[in-house]
């Protein structure tokens, strides 16, 4: 006599497991929204500086937050500078001035030299 087919046990009420596949009513998977971050670039720089060192996801989140913060500060300052001089264009000069105003001493000098190097590399590649 064949045994009745065993079905999977029903999940307990208040179970901690969540449904992993998000599906619409018609059965298709819902497309996940992409979250932009600088994690790929932070990781590349880390490997250039310390090839044998890793980074935790929490530390990567902090680095991503830091890069976003600095970007917003530089962009904000650079957008105010042309207004003072009655101009309507943000150039590399405004970015450079914003960096000089925001970053202290030696850090500003290094940032400006690295930025100049990056702009030169970009223009020569065109």
Swiss-Prot record:
Major localization listed first in the record, in broad terms: nucleus
Classification via InterPro entries: Histone-fold, Histone_H2A/H2B/H3, Histone_H2B, HISTONE_H2B_site
Entry-annotated residues carrying N6,N6-dimethyllysine: 58
Location of the protein in the cell: Nucleus; Chromosome
Region entry Disordered, spans: 1-36
Modified-residue entries (N6-acetyllysine), positions: 6, 12-13, 16-17, 21, 24, 86
Classification via SMART domains: H2B (SM00427)
Residues carrying Phosphothreonine: 116
Residues modified as N6-(2-hydroxyisobutyryl)lysine: 6, 13, 21, 24-25, 35, 44, 47, 58, 86, 109, 117, 121
SUPFAM superfamilies, A to Z: Histone-fold
Modified-residue entries (ADP-ribosyl glutamic acid), positions: 3
Keyword Glycoprotein: yes
Molecular-function GO term, any one: protein heterodimerization activity
Residue numbers carrying N6-crotonyllysine: 6, 12-13, 16-17, 21, 24, 35
Position(s), cross-link Glycyl lysine isopeptide (Lys-Gly) (interchain with G-Cter in ubiquitin): 35, 121
Positions of post-translational Omega-N-methylarginine modification: 87, 93
Residues carrying PolyADP-ribosyl glutamic acid: 36
N6-succinyllysine PTM positions: 35, 117, 121
Glycyl lysine isopeptide (Lys-Gly) (interchain with G-Cter in SUMO2) crosslink location in chain: 6, 21
Alphabetically ordered keywords of this record: Acetylation, ADP-ribosylation, Antibiotic, Antimicrobial, Chromosome, DNA-binding, Glycoprotein, Hydroxylation, Isopeptide bond, Methylation, Nucleosome core, Nucleus, Phosphoprotein, Ubl conjugation
Record field: compositional bias (Low complexity): 1-12
Gene3D superfamilies: Histone, subunit A
Residue list for modification N6-methyllysine: 47, 109
Reported function: Core component of nucleosome. Nucleosomes wrap and compact DNA into chromatin, limiting DNA accessibility to the cellular machineries which require DNA as a template. Histones thereby play a central role in transcription regulation, DNA repair, DNA replication and chromosomal stability. DNA accessibility is regulated via a complex set of post-translational modifications of histones, also called histone code, and nucleosome remodeling. Has broad antibacterial activity. May contribute to the formation of the functional antimicrobial barrier of the colonic epithelium, and to the bactericidal activity of amniotic fluid.
Full protein name: Histone H2B type F-S
Organism annotation: Homo sapiens (Human)
């Amino acid at each position: 006599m064949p045994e009745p087919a065993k079905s999977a046990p029903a999940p307990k009420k208040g179970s901690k497991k969540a449904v992993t596949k998000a599906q619409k009513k018609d059965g298709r998977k819902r497309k996940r929204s992409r979250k932009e971050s600088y994690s790929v670039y932070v990781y590349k720089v880390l490997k250039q500086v310390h090839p044998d060192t890793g980074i935790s996801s929490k530390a990567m989140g902090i680095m991503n937050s830091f890069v976003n913060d600095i970007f917003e500060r530089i962009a904000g300052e650079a957008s105010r500078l042309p207004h003072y001089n009655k101009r309507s264009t943000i150039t590399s000069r405004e970015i450079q001035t914003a960096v000089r105003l925001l970053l202290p001493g030696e850090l500003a000098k290094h940032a400006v030299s690295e930025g100049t190097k990056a702009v030169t590399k970009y223009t020569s590649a065109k």
